[in-house]
């Protein structure tokens, strides 16, 4: 698969987007500089997830941005998403690869150095590592810190996307580790200024030296 731009990886949040126009929210994030969109919903019916995924895929296709579905391979297949992102307790990566083939993207969450080492021999396109900072969007997240991220950057053979509590205030410190790919949730969808929030993150990344 052609290497994709993982630099500003935006993940949806069902609580933050509750009652809002999903198409408009995703379009604003993309207009602000998002390079990947991941749809994550843990507490919705399959029917509702399918309906929302169809909408998100439509806007991602309009702007030629990769669309990833969190966990649910069935939803990803149903809407012909570009790929899936799996957690450590989700479907085995090698099984997912057999189902999806090598044209689709598979990402894998990692929390520990051991997870990263194991992922090196798995058929994944990138890994997510974190939580790098304390986060409010995942209650069970383990805080890893920047020193661990530095280790991961040296060990991983796949592109690394840092995740967890990343915002305008700590992004520069994160970039100093050498990591150039970040996943964000609240930093983008915390209020109605989605495009502006995304633009500020993008500007920090582009101006970092």
UniProtKB/Swiss-Prot annotation:
It comes from the Bacteria. Keywords: Magnesium, Metal-binding, Thiamine biosynthesis, Transferase. It catalyses: 2-[(2R,5Z)-2-carboxy-4-methylthiazol-5(2H)-ylidene]ethyl phosphate + 4-amino-2-methyl-5-(diphosphooxymethyl)pyrimidine + 2 H(+) = thiamine phosphate + CO2 + diphosphate; 2-(2-carboxy-4-methylthiazol-5-yl)ethyl phosphate + 4-amino-2-methyl-5-(diphosphooxymethyl)pyrimidine + 2 H(+) = thiamine phosphate + CO2 + diphosphate; 4-methyl-5-(2-phosphooxyethyl)-thiazole + 4-amino-2-methyl-5-(diphosphooxymethyl)pyrimidine + H(+) = thiamine phosphate + diphosphate. One of its GO terms (molecular function) is thiamine-phosphate diphosphorylase activity. InterPro entries: Aldolase_TIM, ThiamineP_synth_sf, ThiamineP_synth_TenI, TMP_synthase. Mg(2+) binds at residues 71, 90. Gene3D superfamilies: Aldolase class I (3.20.20.70). Pathway: Cofactor biosynthesis; thiamine diphosphate biosynthesis; thiamine phosphate from 4-amino-2-methyl-5-diphosphomethylpyrimidine and 4-methyl-5-(2-phosphoethyl)-thiazole: step 1/1. Its EC number is 2.5.1.3. This is Thiamine-phosphate synthase. It comes from Persephonella marina (strain DSM 14350 / EX-H1). The gene is thiE.
């Amino acid at each position: 698969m052609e290497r994709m731009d993982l630099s500003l990886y935006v993940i949806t949040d069902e609580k933050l987007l509750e009652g809002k126009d999903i198409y408009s929210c995703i379009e604003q994030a993309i207009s602000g500089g998002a390079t990947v969109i991941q749809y994550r919903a843990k507490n919705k019916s399959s029917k509702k997830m399918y309906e929302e995924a169809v909408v998100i895929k439509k806007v991602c296709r309009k702007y030629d941005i990769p669309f990833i579905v969190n966990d649910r391979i069935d939803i990803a297949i149903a809407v012909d998403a570009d790929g899936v992102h799996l957690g450590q307790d989700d479907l085995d990566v090698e099984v997912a690869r057999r189902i999806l083939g090598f044209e689709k993207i598979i990402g894998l969450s990692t929390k520990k150095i051991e997870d990263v080492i194991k992922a090196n021999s798995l058929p994944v396109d990138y890994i997510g590592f974190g939580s790098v900072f304390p986060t409010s969007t995942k209650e069970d997240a383990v805080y890893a810190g920047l020193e661990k991220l530095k280790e991961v950057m040296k060990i991983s053979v796949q592109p690394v996307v840092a995740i967890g509590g990343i915002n305008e205030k700590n992004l520069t410190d994160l970039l100093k580790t050498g990591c150039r790919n970040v996943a964000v949730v609240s930093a983008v969808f915390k209020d109605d200024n989605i495009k502006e929030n995304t633009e500020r993150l993008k500007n920090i990344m582009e101006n970092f030296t």
